[in-house]
Amino acid sequence: MLKIGIIGCGFIGGQICRAIDSGEIDAELYALCDSSESKAFGLAKSLNTCKPAYMKIEELISSVDLVVESASQNAVRFIVPQALKAGCSVMVLSVGALADKELRETLFGLAKKHNCKLYFPSGAVVGIDGINSAHAAGISSVTLTTRKPPSGLMGAPYVVEHGIELEKLEKETILFEGTASEAVKAFPANVNVAATISLAGIGFERTMVRVIADPSLSRNIHEINVEGEFGKFCTKVENLPSPENPKTSYLAALSAISTLKKILNPVQIGT
């Protein structure tokens, strides 16, 4: 049975743990790690059947078959290279870290050298399969428009640096327009989907992103427009925010669970 270690015990990490605990994912939840030991112990205690150990990063990496990173972009930079060098496959949720070209090339190179897998779930969007398919023929443009309630954008570096008073907004307001490379740095906890779209399609510099704050919304909305040799398509998803973290969409956790199930399933459906 596949041994899984989870680094990052927030909303998504917790949802994955509960999916394993319930038997939805047929794997062994072997270990947990978090910058807050109390959070990791609290999560472990809340489970019914699984009894994961709390481990430091190095011990966890050496003990499991698959590391699930659900912590932060900084965690990707620090942890994922270690895991790959140890011959351990990794599922990355803080995909925005890969906007760093040097890090991206390093991770891809290590995965190839050590015969490991890097998994990037679709996250809070739909249409990654279509982008993957369209890329084979050629894509001319990709645009992501993200709309969120102001509470879901609080604390973002771009908001802080520009002194944007989100709580005072009374109508839909465009906060940012730029490349995916710029977006994931400006909103590291909000637009990881921009990174996933970039990896599947035409890259971080050609993928365009628009971030909108809308006080009338109660959901996180992501719309993707793609054009190319194949024709064009548009996808739109209206996500319920996580009750624990309004910056995270519930669908992002479901996507991570689905990816783990796909890894374990001998039957593969879809692109």
From Swiss-Prot:
Q: Which biological process annotations from GO are given for this protein?
A: NAD biosynthetic process
The active-site annotation reads 222
Write out the residues that bind NAD(+).
124, 192
- Bilayer-crossing regions: none
EC annotation from Swiss-Prot or TrEMBL? 1.4.1.21
Matching entries from InterPro entries are given as: Asp/hSer_DH_NAD-bd, Asp_DH, Asp_DH_arc, Asp_DH_prok, L-Asp_DH, NAD(P)-bd_dom_sf
Per UniProt, what is one Pfam family of this protein?
NAD_binding_3
Which UniProt key words apply to this protein?
NAD, NADP, Oxidoreductase, Pyridine nucleotide biosynthesis
Q: Does the keyword Transport apply?
A: no
Q: In which pathway does it act?
A: Cofactor biosynthesis; NAD(+) biosynthesis; iminoaspartate from L-aspartate (dehydrogenase route): step 1/1
The signal peptide here is none
Task: Give the matching Gene3D superfamilies.
Answer: Dihydrodipicolinate Reductase, domain 2, NAD(P)-binding Rossmann-like Domain
Q: Does the keyword NADP apply?
A: yes
Q: Which reaction does it catalyse?
A: L-aspartate + NADP(+) + H2O = oxaloacetate + NH4(+) + NADPH + H(+); L-aspartate + NAD(+) + H2O = oxaloacetate + NH4(+) + NADH + H(+)
Q: Name one GO molecular function term.
A: oxidoreductase activity, acting on the CH-NH2 group of donors, NAD or NADP as acceptor
Further remark: The iminoaspartate product is unstable in aqueous solution and can decompose to oxaloacetate and ammonia.
What exactly does this protein do?
Answer: Specifically catalyzes the NAD or NADP-dependent dehydrogenation of L-aspartate to iminoaspartate.
Family per record: Belongs to the L-aspartate dehydrogenase family.
Could you tell me what this protein is called?
Answer: L-aspartate dehydrogenase
